[in-house]
Amino acid sequence: MLTVPQQTIRSGCKINLFLEITGVRPDGYHELVTLFYPLSEPFDLMEISPATHGVTVLSERADLCGDKNIICKAWHTFAAAGGTPPPMQVRLAKGVPDGAGLGGGSANAAAVLKLLNTAGGAPRFSDTALAKIAAQVGADVPFFLHNTPCLATGIGEKLVPAPLDLSGWHLVLVCPGVQVSTPWAYNRWDTLYRSGLHHPCGQLPAAHAPAACAQLQTTGPDRPVRAETGCAGRKKNTCRSLTTERQADSKPVSRALWLFNSFETVVFSAYSELRQHKNTLLAHGASAALMSGSGSSLFGLFRDKAQAEAAMLHFCQRSIAVYVHRL
């Protein structure tokens, strides 16, 4: 019988640099186009120990224990696919907040799948096969197997690496402690869309997203990418950059992309404090700010380190969790 060595695994999180809901499938799942970007902090810690049978998740939080944890789902899905996962106990210490749109649980699942796949030495499944298993565990799980910037389509499981270079920028991630239910956010979007109160049109049409990502490295400030907008009847326009800035930039943030999130309209209408946090990031000098996923976390992109640190201090003084990343 295979055994897993005792070890501690650290799993991070992600943000969505843009997210547009493009439709609803007959089975109720939502199609989208999004750009995942991995972050190393906040993070969860998983202490892995060998066990006699099955998989057990322990935590100081009772709601994380038991078979409903996504870690258990990953273990059982791996076994059902023909793998031979070693018995293990996982002691989980959460650092990634729940209901924040950061994918902490998905990152846990991906880390466990990678561990299981190499438990016997040589990988049991190919990268492609493991990604298919990951998609059965959760829509965001395949991304964390890559853990590099990726364009995602479908329900988030169809991934293409994105040549995105944000080096030199400072990212301020704000985690307000508000939990936003992803099913609630989708249902709210459906209600507003079907009532005509919220048009599903985003600023980055799905059909142009792959081409936009392909040009991230080659598009300069004097050569903006042109693309149709997502709403019928609009004329062809020159795409704005990821930020609202116009100055010359040897490393444009993303002249081909729109910074957009379909969930902001519906989530901000119910959680007005999140809109205020976004405005605070912009007021402190962020070149751009956005909510990640279905919320509640938000991030701002800063050129200036001092401005990023000032924004961090603002939230720290109000006992709001905040993280600064130099990209």
UniProtKB/Swiss-Prot annotation:
Single Gene Ontology BP annotation: isopentenyl diphosphate biosynthetic process, methylerythritol 4-phosphate pathway
**Any idea which positions bind ATP?**
97-107
The catalytic residues are 14, 140
| Disulphide-bridged cysteine pairs | none
Alphabetically sorted, this entry's keywords are: ATP-binding, Isoprene biosynthesis, Kinase, Nucleotide-binding, Transferase
EC code(s) of this entry: 2.7.1.148
A molecular function (GO) held by this record is:
ATP binding
Q: Which NCBIfam families match?
A: ispE
Family matches, as PANTHER family: 4-DIPHOSPHOCYTIDYL-2-C-METHYL-D-ERYTHRITOL KINASE, CHLOROPLASTIC (PTHR43527:SF2)
Q: Indicate the family of this protein.
A: Belongs to the GHMP kinase family. IspE subfamily.
Q: Which HAMAP family match?
A: IspE
Biological function: Catalyzes the phosphorylation of the position 2 hydroxy group of 4-diphosphocytidyl-2C-methyl-D-erythritol.
Name the UniProt record assigns to this protein: 4-diphosphocytidyl-2-C-methyl-D-erythritol kinase
| Lineage start | Bacteria, Pseudomonadati, Thermodesulfobacteriota, Desulfovibrionia, Desulfovibrionales
Q: Which gene encodes it?
A: ispE
